[in-house]
Amino acid sequence: MFLVNSFLKGGGGGGGGGGGLGGGLGNVLGGLISGAGGGGGGGGGGGGGGGGGGGGTAMRILGGVISAISEAAAQYNPEPPPPRTHYSNIEANESEEVRQFRRLFAQLAGDDMEVSATELMNILNKVVTRHPDLKTDGFGIDTCRSMVAVMDSDTTGKLGFEEFKYLWNNIKRWQAIYKQFDTDRSGTICSSELPGAFEAAGFHLNEHLYNMIIRRYSDESGNMDFDNFISCLVRLDAMFRAFKSLDKDGTGQIQVNIQEWLQLTMYS
């Protein structure tokens, strides 16, 4: 067993699936995302060099990373995604907006009533084409696989209705934040705009973590486009929620074995 200290510090809380859905679904979802309310890793160690020097360097690097992330989890109070429910279990008090979303989800998800990574990629890319002010290379299949994985609470490899709704609501909110903090209207978030955007999303990180994120998700000039911004926040939200679920006594520390650690980190 080994100890993993607190992760970060913050809180957090797709476009038509191909020709069969036609432009109507894309138009409706594009409208939904436009109507969003405003506001809103790290280095492993090196090998063991002569006389133990390499091992000492490795431990210092790892210790620095853990120290950087250990200040964060205490203030994170996410609302977990609602439990999965069968599509037919529609509550009488659902709003018309939720009922409409269920109908759209049914069209998108198909007979299995789940959204795959490919279906998610199609819907997100159809929506972002309606927003030329968002600079993006498009959502790739690997990005969407990662997004599905971190939201996939029952490890089916797909998103059920509640999982997809939770993801979609976050994307709407984060899109509004992205536009708000793109102050120079470049279509990207630059390194100086990033802290404000992340704090508006509820993630209060230290400088070391911001630098790590910029190196991982931004281009060589330090600019982060929309798909990388969303991908990063989806991952942060999922990591925070996973940590909180394991930190049952609220100490800011969790203890996991190697199998639990691999399960947590590899399927994401």
UniProtKB/Swiss-Prot annotation:
Organism: Homo sapiens
Residues noted as binding Ca(2+) 4 in the record, renumbered to the chain: 137, 225
Single Gene Ontology BP annotation: regulation of macroautophagy
Residue numbers binding Ca(2+) 2: 152, 154, 156, 158, 163
Name the record gives this protein: Calpain small subunit 1
Locations listed in the record: Cytoplasm; Cell membrane
GO cellular component term, pick one: calpain complex
Nucleus is among the record's keywords: no
Disease involvement: Pulmonary hypertension, primary, 6: A form of primary pulmonary hypertension, a disease defined by plexiform lesions of proliferating endothelial cells in pulmonary arterioles. The lesions lead to elevated pulmonary arterial pression, right ventricular failure, and death. Primary pulmonary hypertension exhibits incomplete penetrance, sex bias and variable age of onset, both within and between families. PPH6 is an autosomal recessive form.
Primary residence: cytoplasm
Domain notes: The contact of the 5th EF-hand domain from each monomer allows the formation of the homodimer and also appears to mediate the contact between the large catalytic subunit and small regulatory subunit for the formation of the heterodimer.
N-acetylmethionine: residues bearing it: 1
Residues that, per the record, bind Ca(2+) 1: 109, 112, 114, 119
Annotated residues for binding of Ca(2+) 3: 182, 184, 186, 188, 193
Oligomer and partners: Homodimer or heterodimer of a large (catalytic) and a small (regulatory) subunit. In presence of calcium, the heterodimer dissociates.
